[in-house]
Amino acid sequence: MATRTPDPKSTANGTAPAIDSVSKAIIEQLQEDGRRPYAAIGKAVGLSEAAVRQRVQKLLDQGVMQIVAVTDPLTLGFRRQAMVGVNVQGDIEPVADALAEMEEVDYVVVTAGSFDLLIEVVCEDDDHLLETINKRIRTLPGVRSTESFVYMKLRKQTYTWGTR
C-alpha cells in the first residue's frame, strides 16, 4: 500500500505547525531511540509521561514525524538497491502515484534538476532489478527515460539529523 507522507511544513490550514524547543527535544530523544519510554523522555525534557505522550501524538497527527522500524534490506534477502532517475513526459503526478504503488519502490520524490522524479528500488537480485526497471517502470505511461544508479556499498544512512 502506497502512502503519501504529509508535508511536514504545513497543516490542514496551510500554516507550518509550531514546534517549540521541548517538542524538538522529544523528537531528538526518539531519533536516538524510537522505543525510549515516555517516562524517560519526560525526565530528559522536563515533562510528565502523559504530557510527552500527548505531544508525541500531536507530532504524529501533524505529520511532523513518524515512528517506524528501519530494517536492513540485506538481512531480509534484498541484495540489490538502486536509485533511479525518471524523466516524465506530461503530468508528473500520475507517474509518481504509479511508482509509489510498486512494492519494490520505497522512496519517490519529485525533483527539480536533471530528473523529474527520483525513486529508490529495493530488489532481491540483479534479475529482479532488471525486470522492475525494464518491464514495470519503463513501460508506465508517461515515462520518457530512466537512469539507474546501482548501490555498490552503503557508507552512511542516518535518521538522526536532529531538528535544526
Regions found by a protein language model. Name each.
Residues M1-R164:
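A compositional/biophysical signature of low hydrophobicity enriched in polar/charged and small residues
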